[in-house]
Amino acid sequence: MASEMEKADALLHTFSTASAFSSLGLGLFCFVADRVQQATFIQQHDWLRALSDSTTHCVIGMWSWAIVIGLRKRSDFCEVALAGFFASIIDLDHFFLAGSVSLKAATNLQRRPPLHCSTLIPVVALALKFLMQLLRLKDSWCFLPWMLFISWTSHHVRDGIRHGLWICPFGNTAPLPYWLYVVITASLPSVCSLIMCLTGTRQLMTTKHGIHIDV
């Protein structure tokens, strides 16, 4: 577990000016990106609309993880890119459920595809954590469950403004208010980063990779 000094340091960094501006920028990006996607020339083309939507998911995932780790060395960009991949790859389950590469079929499903079940996020993150412990990878890859959790959660919350959250086995919530989506997305990296500090994940990342959490 993290020491009391590390916990205090986490609190100071979480509420730092840099964190506030980074989170504000993320929230502003969400707003601007959604407005851009409402442009007529995007809405008139299915593939362009799908591409812009996936790109927004990707950028939000990348931005969120960048807030968590900071961008101090070349390997950090690889982690940020991986977070963006996790955030956008979820939508491939549309094609899996449709059993077709047709975009029309993938976007006109009778039910939501499996990776859009929000209950899976903590389940998969915890399963990944236990698997890493079993394979003795918990130190070198301790960031991975958190990266997946943040990337997938940001995707689900953004989808939630249209469809609500699918909480198995209870069903779907009402669509999320837009302001709540922006607030959750902007604050999620800092909240998770703080929890990482309090649980000792930050310390492992620092000692193994020289990563300094910048929240």
From Swiss-Prot:
Domain of life: Eukaryota
Keyword Transmembrane: yes
Membrane topology recorded in Swiss-Prot or TrEMBL: Multi-pass membrane protein
Alphabetized UniProt keyword annotations: Membrane, Transmembrane, Transmembrane helix
Localization terms from the record: Membrane
Signal peptide: none
InterPro entries according to UniProt: TMEM267 (IPR026572)
Cellular component annotations (GO), alphabetically ordered: membrane
Transmembrane residue ranges: 77-97, 114-134, 178-198
Protein name, per record: Transmembrane protein 267
Species per Swiss-Prot/TrEMBL record: Xenopus laevis
Gene transcribed to yield this protein: tmem267
